[in-house]
Structures are given as C-alpha cells and as structure tokens.
Regions:
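Phosphate-binding and adjacent anionic-ligand microenvironments
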Residues: 270-272, 276, 285-288, 310-498
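N-terminal small/polar loop signature for handling phosphorylated ligands or for N-terminal nucleophile
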Residues: 43, 54-121, 223-285
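Buried hydrophobic positions in well-ordered alpha/beta secondary-structure cores of metabolic enzymes
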Residues: 19, 55, 95, 108, ...
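Short glycine-rich or small-residue beta-strand-to-loop segments that form or flank ligand, phosphate
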Residues: 24, 52-58, 111, 126-128, ...
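Proline/glycine-rich low-complexity loops and linkers
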Residues: 87, 137-183, 287-364, 368-369
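Gly/Ser/Thr-enriched, mixed-charge loops and adjacent short helices
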Residues: 2-11, 32, 119-268
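Positively charged, low-complexity intrinsically disordered leader regions
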Residues: 1-36
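Glycine-rich phosphate/diphosphate-binding loops that line cofactor/substrate pockets in enzymes
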Residues: 38-53, 195-203
Length: 500
C-alpha cells in the first residue's frame, strides 16, 4: 500500500462538544478540515497501528464521502480492521453494540444527531471509546490538544472500495468488513425483551405508528417491528434514510414529528406512537392523543422495567442528567435504589454503567438507555415500552395516569433560545452566577428561593470533577428552574431554560 503524508496546519474550531465535533456540512467539506480531525482522533488515542474500529453514520449528506476518507486514513495509519455498516449506515446504538461485541478499540460515528442534514445542514464526527460509549473528557481533551499542533496527516493513495456490498476487501494490511447494519442489533434486542409477548399483542390487533423521520432507524424499525414482531405493514413511516432527512428536522418532539402527532391525535389513532432521531439514539413516545414527556418516560420505564426479561431482577440504580425532571427520583426512592444526577451528556453515564452502579439512564432531551450498550437507544426504549404494555395490559394513557396517582406529577417544560451571540449568552450566565450567593431568601413571583448553585459533578467512580454544568435555582415549595448553555449547536450559543 502506498500512502501520502500531507502537510497541514491547525484549523480553528475543532474542540469537541458533548457529542463530538459538529459543524455546518460546508465547514467539514473545507480543505483538510475532516482530515485534520480524523488524524487527531488517531494521534490523540495512541495511534491507529494494529487497531480495529467500527465506522458508520446516519446517512446524512457527506456520510459516504467522509467514510471513504476515514477508510483511506485508517489504512495509512496502520489500522488492522474496520467494521462498517452497508452503505455507511449504522445507528449510534448499533455502533456502540458492535464496538462492545467485537471488542474493538473504538468507533467513529458520523452524525449531527437530531440536527438537520443536507448540503446546507449540519455534520458531525464523534469518537466512541472501546467500551462503546462517547469518549470521556480526558480523551476528547487529548484529541483537541492534537488539533492545536497538527502538522501533517496520512492518507492511502488507493480508493476506499465499495461499501455498498456486504463482504470484505483490503487496503494494504487493513481489512474492511462491510456488514448488515441490523443483524447484530436485532439479536441483542431479542435477548433483552419478550418478543413472544409483543408479537402476541400485535397478533391481537395492537397497532403502532413509528416515525423514522427519514433517518437511520428506518431499516432497524422496519425489520424488527414489521418483520420479526408482526406489526402491520406500513406501521413504520418515513422509513428510508435520506441525506437531508426528507427536508425535515430529525428531532423527535411534537414540533418536528408533527406528522406522527397528527396521526396519534386523529380519528382511529393507533394504540402507540413513537419516533426516533437522525442517528437513532433518541425517542419520542405517544399514547392515543397524548405525548409522554421524556422525563415521565424515564420514570415509567424505571417503575415497570421488571416486566422485561433483561431487567426482571432488581435494578442496580438509575441515573439522570441534572436538568431532567426529578420524577424518576421518586421511583428510585420507592424501589430502594440509588439515583445519580450527572451533567448533560451521555458520556457522564459511562463510568456508572461500567461500574455496575446504574442499570437505566435518561435525559430530558429524549435519550433513554440501559447497560446493554453505552449510548442512549431510541428503538430500545420503544421496545421496552412495548414489552411493558404487552405484559401489563393497560394502555399508555392509563399507565401514566395511574403512575401519577401513585407517585405524584412533576410538571416540566424546557425553553430553547438558539443561535444567540456567544458573548451575550456567556455574559448572562456570568451575571447570574455573580448573583447566586444573594438569591436564597429572596422572593420571585411570590415564591421564596431556597437554594442557588452552579452544578458541579464529582464522578463517584474516577473522582473527576466537571464544573459549571448549569445554574440551579431551587424554591421552598420544591419547584426549581435551571439555566445552561448547550454544547450541541453548530453556530452561536444555545441557552436552555428548564422549569419544574
């Protein structure tokens, strides 16, 4: 194999956020931008020599071109083996599972998650560690440090090969294995859930509408829900992955999944509605005419997880991101299990899962998952819901109503202020932090402030400290509001305000 060493220089703006590096697609297509970052992934993790990686993405615009570049660079950097989804398609949960199942050295996932795609949309590159989870800060910091000093990258002369056909080919000493993107993931789901009970429920007339939002989950949901479990044909809508997600915004919430909402609120609505996002790690749940908030979904799944075979024993614990409502805390207290509060970002759950401290995890941003992989998992959440409904017998609305009667209800909302000037956003947060010490005891709209702090997280496993993770204002009656800046946007700043 012949390869070239191309001279380059550091490019500004390559600091990974909570879920890798996300930018406008046009930025990733600029000369050396992708190549620099990929080389720094290899250099920042001890080099690629002799290593195996999982590679895939959500099918958005520039996915195949980026994978071709990664194949050539991995080969030039001495990688031993690449496992790639056919046509470059791999959901983030499936990539996490493959990383763990085949004991690879990590995964390179191409996605900007729920952000829009297309030539004028967003693109992203994320490195997952060998445990299948998002790289922790010590790794992303090392990658970022390399971006500040890079002088060259390596790339093979040879073309990347055809990833549209299942099989293997080689570039030099690097073997590229193209696999069916669904097979391994479906086998895992069959181990976790009572497929017989779910199939029987569908056979008895239960109906579902799953909106794949023209994103990566389409092939997975069609194969598993319609093919294996017997849901009626057409239950999965918008099932074909599209480079621009059908011109939509693949974010599973009532605004962007309005087609699903209209179906679930219409005449003759199905019994259950669900949607997933760009890379398949988020979920939206609906009953007839009713949206289930992600925070309530996490609480309900925790309360009824024992109905699924994989979670029939006592849960080790549950974890939620700090802005997520405390509904799940009430369930954990009754079950007698610990409830961990972490910063936003799935990577913070990784140590808890690896150490066996938590079984289920969730975020208010529509991500839920468990210890089966090290990522949140949209279709997993849907299947756990179906397992619960099949075994319990109540519908979604009744199950939630009974849950509120038993545990009480946490009223909750989130408000996003997007693409605001970064200086203005940081200035607002700095001003709020400066006032925190004087807030307790003051009145706001007739409510007394009881506490105010800037959330800091000391990881109970490795004692790493993450500071300035969001300002929390607590009131005497138990209400609270939270303000934080998000790390998943591609330009400007996103300010999120949470009310509970």
């Amino acid at each position: 194999m012949r390869f070239k060493t191309i001279k380059t220089a550091p490019i500004e703006g390559q600091k990974p956020g909570t879920s890798g590096l996300r930018k406008k697609t046009a930025v990733f297509r600029e000369p050396n931008f992708l190549e620099n970052f990929v080389q720094c992934i290899f250099d920042g993790t001890g080099g690629a020599t002799g290593k195996t990686y999982v590679v895939g993405g959500d099918g958005r615009f520039f996915n195949k071109e980026a994978i071709a570049t990664i194949i050539r660079m991995a080969a030039a950097n001495g990688a031993k083996r690449l496992i790639i989804g056919q046509d470059g398609i791999l959901s983030t949960p499936a990539a996490s599972h493959l990383t763990r199942k085949y004991k690879t050295d990590g995964g390179i996932i191409l996605s900007a998650s729920h952000n829009p795609g297309g030539a004028n949309g967003d693109f992203g590159v994320k490195f997952n560690a060998s445990n299948g989870g998002p790289a922790p800060e010590k790794i992303t910091d090392a990658i970022f440090a390399k971006t500040l000093e890079i002088t060259a990258y390596k790339i093979a002369d040879e073309a990347a090969g055809d990833i549209g056909k299942i099989g293997t080919f080689s570039i030099g000493e690097c073997q590229i294995e193209v696999i069916d993107c669904v097979d391994d993931y479906e086998l895992l789901m069959q181990e976790l859930f009572d497929f017989d009970a779910i199939s029987a429920m569908f056979a008895n007339g239960f109906r579902i509408c799953f909106d794949a939002m023209h994103a990566v989950t389409g092939p997975y949901a069609t194969r598993i829900l319609e093919g294996t479990l017997g849901a009626p044909k057409g239950s999965v809508i918008n099932a074909i992955p599209s480079p621009d997600f059908g011109g939509g915004h693949p974010d599973p919430n009532p605004v962007w999944a309005s087609e699903l909402v209209a179906i679930m609120e219409g005449d003759n609505a199905p019994d259950f509605g669900a949607a997933s996002d760009g890379d398949g790690d988020r979920n939206m749940i609906m009953g007839k005419g009713s949206f289930v908030s992600p925070s309530d979904s996490l609480a309900l799944l925790t309360a009824y997880a024992h109905l699924a075979p994989a979670y029939a024993g006592k849960l080790a614990g549950v974890a939620r991101s700090m802005p997520t409502s405390r509904a799940v805390d009430l369930v954990a207290e009754r079950l007698g299990i610990p409830c961990f509060e972490t910063p936003t970002g799935w990577k913070f759950f990784g140590n808890l899962l690896d150490a066996g401290k938590a079984t289920l995890c969730g975020e208010e941003s529509a991500g839920t998952g468990s210890n089966h992989i090290r990522e949140k998992d949209g279709l997993w959440a849907v299947l756990l819901w179906l397992n619960i409904l099949a075994r319990d017998g109540r519908d979604v609305v009744q199950l939630r109503a009974d849950h509120w009667r038993s545990f009480g209800r946490n009223y909750y909302s989130r408000h996003d202020y997007e693409e605001i000037p970064t200086q203005a956003a940081t200035g607002l947060m700095d001003a709020l932090r400066a006032k925190m010490a004087d807030l307790p005891g003051t009145q706001v709209a007739g409510m007394e402030v009881n506490s105010a702090d800037d959330f800091a997280y000391s990881d109970p496993i490795d004692q790493s400290l993450s500071e300035q993770q969001g300002v929390r204002i607590g009131f005497k009656d138990g209400s609270r509001f939270v303000m934080r800046l998000s790390g998943t946007g591609t330009q400007g700043a996103t300010l999120r305000v949470y009310l509970e």
